[in-house]
Amino acid sequence: MDVLWLTLADPEPRHNGQFVYSGGLIDAVAAAGAKVKVLALERPESPRRNGAGGENISWQLAEHDPRSRLASLASPLPHLAHRSFTRSMRRNLAELLESQTWHSIVFDGISVGWALRPVQRWFLGARDRPKLVYISHNHEESLRAAVASNQTSGVKRWGIQIDAAKVARLERSLVDAVDLVTAITPEDGDLYRARRPDKPIDVLTPGYCGRRLDRRSITAAMPRRAVVVGSFDWIAKRMNLEEFVNAADPIFATAGAELQVVGSGEESFFDRLRKGATATEFTGRVKSVSPYLDRARIAVVPERSGGGFKLKVLEYVFNRMPILALAGSVSGVPLHDRDGILLYRDHEELAKGILTVMDDVALLNHMQERAYELCRDEFSWSRRGQHLLSTIAAL
């Protein structure tokens, strides 16, 4: 099967959930036997260049051409898709559509939603067009609406609401046009089915290929520390983190506990949070999160906005970190409150819950062992690739 795979950018290095998911699926589909041609933007931090190839994968990388959020205001495209709506990407897409016969064209995320119209125009009137697949990373319409409603600044909320309306229009167009939609969680799948019950919707949770610890023992000798790992470049991630730090930091400081935030984000954002924090450390981007997980007792998922599948949850599970989270923030994994995870209603309850169990090392070890047991055999990338290919072939 010859697959034209359209995605935002070269996924290397895979330092956030979007790149982990895209890169994992591309590798898995190629390993399952498809010949995959990937069209994406170059990334300066990646060693890969245009024309690079591997077994069953070849890369057509358009010039790196950053586009500002302000530039998208005048476009009918949302900022997510406007980023890759470059002259080089459009030219490369036209060349690839003309170059050969494709069995399937994959729209990997709403970021390449702009490509729908040129693809439709190219195959207008064709009796045998490729199967079109939309790989969703979130149910974007509901997610962006939630992010806008949680924004406290009136001006920012107005801007986010306008962009959210653009997202909704583009996502609906993609869902209506393609032959198959994949959802990253069962909950997202239900949202797509509610509007289009006639559309083939398949749940395609991520796989995991990172570090797995055979065993780990949390002891009283370890720092009384909880850790939040993530990429904090997106506004929803920053909102979640700021709300949690504001609630947790004074409680942790009083209890003599530590909160460590590990991951990338604008330094000005971290500097602002540092000014009001006593018990919280912000590391910025690190080469590996493993040493930070090894020195913490608890992993935290404090996300009120953001939707979708949290790939860091798998990293926590397979590194044997007991997880405490906001209710509703952990989807797509076989963990349930008091069975491999502890869930709380709001940030204050979450912070207090962390301190309640911080010194109960027997409970913490039971939690990490149970979560590992529940997830051990559930997140294979190879099975994801085989499943996606067989689903496309059956359309």
State each model region's role:
Residues I341-E348, T356-V361:
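Conserved acidic donor-binding segment of nucleotide-sugar-dependent glycosyltransferases
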Residues G17, D359-I392:
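A charged, aromatic-enriched C-terminal amphipathic alpha-helix characteristic of glycosyltransferases
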Residues D179, D294-G308, M321-P322:
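Acidic donor-binding loop of glycosyltransferase active sites
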Residues M1-E55, E98-Q100:
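N-terminal subdomain of nucleotide-sugar transferases
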Residues E141, I160-L213:
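Donor nucleotide-sugar binding/catalytic pocket of nucleotide-sugar-dependent glycosyltransferases
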Residues R67-H79, V133-K166, G328:
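Acceptor-binding helix/loop patch of EC 2.4 sugar-transfer enzymes
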Residues K312-E315, P322-L326:
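Short hydrophobic beta-strand element within catalytic cores of glycosyltransferases
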Residues V203-T278, F282-D294:
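Conserved catalytic-core segment of nucleotide-activated headgroup transferases in glycan assembly
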